Amino acid sequence: MAKVKTPRWGWALTGSGHFFKECLALVGELDEVDLFVTRAAAEVLRMYKQDLRLPKSTRIFRDTTASAAPVGAFYYGVYHTLVLGPATSNTVAKCVVGISDTLATNVFAQAGKCRVPSIVFACDTAPEMETEAPKGMVKVYPRRIDLENTARLKDVDDVIVVETLAQLGTALSRRKRELA
């Protein structure tokens, strides 16, 4: 496979409902994006009754192979940036310790191995939070280990961890300027 002329955004969705709809809206605003949908994200799409109405140039990869075959594209320069968000505490923990057993954690690992910068929108970032569940807003209380893993992820090379939707928007804008 030859190196591509115009690298794309990669965006991995996990099984979190935290700002899920807003993340999908941001995906729709990007040019040339590939969406990696984990099995858990597919469940959340159904629970939140979300359709993937995205630009025609968007390619969708689902978590259907044991080896997460789509990750091979990272080796050939297909992606300039990976966005992982919303990222569950489970996904963040796996990223911190190097476990890559889902489509999301596999693309994160391959992005790191190929020095593709990653932006991670972590869900569990404060001791007390409000988040949207399928039937409305709920309070959640992330565990200390979840908060510690989010902090540890900030020390991973080529990774920017954002904790709010506003920070995600800023990180995306900054990356667009870097690529221009």
Please give the residue ranges for each predicted region.
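A cross-family phosphate/adenosyl-ligand binding-site feature
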Residues: 1-180
